[in-house]
Amino acid sequence: MPSSPKIKKEDMLQAALELVSKNGYAALNIKAVARELGCSTAPISWQFGGMDGLRAELIPFAEQYVEDKYYSRNENELATFEQKGKGTIDLALENPNLFRFLYTGERSQLLSTGFELQTNNPDVANVYQKMAELLGITPKQVMDFAMTMMVYTQGIGTLIASGIVKDTKENMYRMLHNTGMTYLKGLGVKDSTLWDLSGGDRSDESSSNG
């Protein structure tokens, strides 16, 4: 047995990620990954110790891929939070198999870099505090808002990835934005504050006024 595999671990994970993206989670196995790489199963088994090990390491690898491709930071915490929601919609539209791998079915897991509420994480708690200060509400209200939007966005994403809902990206973005703005208004956030923080996007008003 060689002391180290000739094929890099990252290449194996990339091949597994592409396999899931193309054919779905059910197609993921060591033989299929080996076929993608044009090698035997030995180096993959050596690297991960079997399918359980491969799956365990593919999850954070896939999360980082989603973070890099679909999420980006914006000028304030609220805009960054909304971008994560838009990124989740993009993922469901563009890569439904990967969405299902991360969010639904046997391999169900919330993205740790996305909407998951990590209340024991000081960095995340600081984000909620900053959002509360921006919006003029309490951190508890921000957490309730975040959880509501997480459930709403996950629901939209699941319907998209399942092929049940077929609509344009722009309409999905508008639905997400309008729902968030309506919820925040219900918490007493001033219209002027929402206007400033959303960059002047009043799509909710224009759509409701016909």
Predicted regions and their residues:
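Amphipathic alpha-helical packing segments from all-alpha helical-bundle domains
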Residues: E67-Y70, Q109-G136, M143-T148, R174-G188
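Short hydrophobic clusters on alpha-helical segments that form packing/core surfaces
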Residues: M12-V20, A62, V66, T88, ...
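Basic, helix-initiating cap at the start of DNA-binding domains
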Residues: M1-N23, A27, K31-A32, E36, ...
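Alpha-helical DNA-contacting segments of helix-turn-helix folds
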Residues: V20, G53-A62, K69, L102, ...
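Hydrophobic alpha-helical connector segments
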Residues: E57, Y71-L98, P139, A146-M149
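Hydrophobic alpha-helical segments that form the core
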Residues: K140-S162, Y173-T182, L197-E205, N209-G210
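Short secondary-structure transition hinges
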Residues: D90, E94-L135, T158, V165, ...
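Short hydrophobic/aromatic patch on the recognition helix
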Residues: L37-F48
